[in-house]
Every structure is written in C-alpha cells, then in structure tokens.
Amino acid sequence: MTYNELKSEENKYVMNTYGRFPIALDHGKGATLWDVEGKKYIDLASGIGVNCLGYDNPIIVNAITEQAHKIMHASNLFTTEPMVQVAKKLVEKTHLNGKVFFANSGAESNEGAIKLARKYSFDKYGEGRYKIVTLINSFHGRTVTTLKATGQDRFHNYFFPFTEGFDYAVANDFDDVRCKVDDMTCAIMMELVQGEGGVLPLDPAFVKQVEALCREKDLLLIIDEVQTGIGRTGSLFAFQQYGIRPDVVTMAKGLGGGVPIGAVLAADTCCNVLTPGTHATTFGGTPMVCAAANAVLDNVGDPKFLHEVKQKGEYLKNGILALGKDSIHGVRGMGLMLGIIVDEGKHSAYANKLIENGVLAITAGKNAVRLLPPLVISKDEALSVMAKVF
C-alpha cells in the first residue's frame, strides 16, 4: 500500500493518540530504514532507543526464530531457561547481587519498582511511609501512577484522580531534594539522563549526595534506566558511570532489541520484598522475548562494544559542534543518547527537515533534537546530512 492509502486506513481504524511523522516505514537493515515508497533513511531514533542492534540483525533474528520453534510463551507458573539466563546476566553484569522481575515495558517496570519500594517500607516501618520523591522534568511512564511520578505538570491532566504520594524536587539541587524528604518518604526515583525532559544528564556530585541521603534515611534509590540502559550511554547502565549502587534499576527499550520487554532489577538490599501474590504479569519474561534479550546482552554487554558506543557518541557530538552552525547552541548527553540544542520551539521543525533529508530523528523537551541511533551505526552515517539541515 502507498503512504496515502495506509494513512487513510489508519485514520479510520487506529486511535489518534500519536503525532506521527508523514512516512510509513516498511523495512530496515543495520541503521538504515526504507518507507513504503522506497525512500531511504538513516535512523537516528531506533524506535525511541529500542532497536539497539539495528534492523535485520541475524543475532536477534536467529535468537527469536530458534526460540519460536520451541515455545514462544509460557505462564509464569512455570520456569523457562531463557528467563533465568537473562536474570543471571543482569545480576552478574551489574554486581548488585540481587534478583529480577520481568515486565513488558518501561512504565510497567517503574510501576513494579514503585510497588517494591512501598512494600519495602511497609514491611519495615508499617503504614504511612509511602511517598516517593522524583525530579522536576522527569518522565517515568504513561500509566496513571507513572504519569504522577513524572515531574512535568503538562502530563497531570484529564485522568483524575492520579495516584497520590509523589513529591517533585529540582534536578541538581540537593537542598531541594532534602527538603522534599520527610517521615513519609520511602524512596527517591531518578533518571540519570532525563530523556523526554530534554536529554539532560544529572550532575555526578548531586547523584552521589542523593545516594548518601538514601542510605542515611533508609530510602530505596530507584534509578530509571528505561532509556539510558542497555549500552545507550556507553556503559551497560548509566549508573555504572556515576559510581553509585542503586537499590532498584528499571529497564526496557533496548533490552529486547525490538521486542517488548521490561525488567525490575532489585539489589540484595530489597530483592526479596515482592513475594507470590504481591506482583505478577502474564507476559513478563516470556521465552521468545528473553531469547532476544539474551542475544542483546551477549553483544551489548561486551566491553569492546561499549567502548565503541562511547567513541561513536564523542565523534558524533564533536562532528555536530564542528559544523559551527549558529542554529546549534550545544550538544548534551552521554554515549549515543544526545540532544542537539536549538532555539526553543524550533526542535520539531529541525526534526521534520532532517526527515525530508533522509534522517530520522525525534525531539525532547522544549529545545532538543534527540538522537538515539542504533548502537551499531557507523561513525559517519549521519554527519553528512547535518550540514544541510542546521
């Protein structure tokens, strides 16, 4: 079908919940995509950080195919080998000595972390200690609870009443965080690079102070690595570059390399809090998606691969800055999670212009063109187009 034919059918049958770009994607290879009209695009979005190993990668395709011939789904009333393997790899590669709960998305993973934190506190201190401090400009999901955890007022509409129990502090302002913590607080939850908020890395000194506060007050430190995790920043998880030890790490996006999976990794401080009957999901940890996740971790977890991600990120960042364009006010981020800073309100226009020139990019915050390419992208694939656009 042509784009116009597909769009007509979409308008008729699909809920209008997304502001879509005017293209219909058909297939891909590596870091390149083609639409239904045959136009070629360099992908700097990777499905919002999902397709970490690119498209038609035999590593992923073979893992999924082989597992599909065995068993695609099994109830969590039974044990399956791919699930156990993924959990073991996550625990061993993070040195948190904990355990994993599997979910289907980032929002579900964050919901699980919120439940875990509240039960941890309930078990130790009883009722009344349930509040969680998050950061202004954060994003933690689109369920009724994770929307409320999100520190952006524009998301707090329509769906009243939201889940109570969230306070918001200014990022990189430790005094404000300390002021927001009281006797009813059970956890602090943060993204180390605020993705939807504008690709804003947190200050390492601030993060260390927050960790120390959590230890002082017996609060769980929850690090939302839904977007930063699985090699995106040049380490398997961003917290490893900050030198901290979280109690809980949430993840999704790149973990499945293109198939839906999320996970809650709890350290030894709290990994036995959730028990039978307190949390569950039908599809979490199903064999086929875990087969894909195993393939991803075997490759992205390689130190050489992660070093190359850092190198590519620096090369792309420096190459963009070297263009010397007045329209570019800076580039921020870590690894291959970058934001090109432009005039406020102009980021969507630049993203559209990139698409016209055969590059897929997305936006973040009020002034960032967000780059989240497949981690396998070559160094030079995107730079040639940037000069035409900015």
Please describe what each predicted stretch is.
Residues 1-390:
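Conserved N-terminal phosphate-binding loop of PLP-dependent enzymes in the Aspartate aminotransferase
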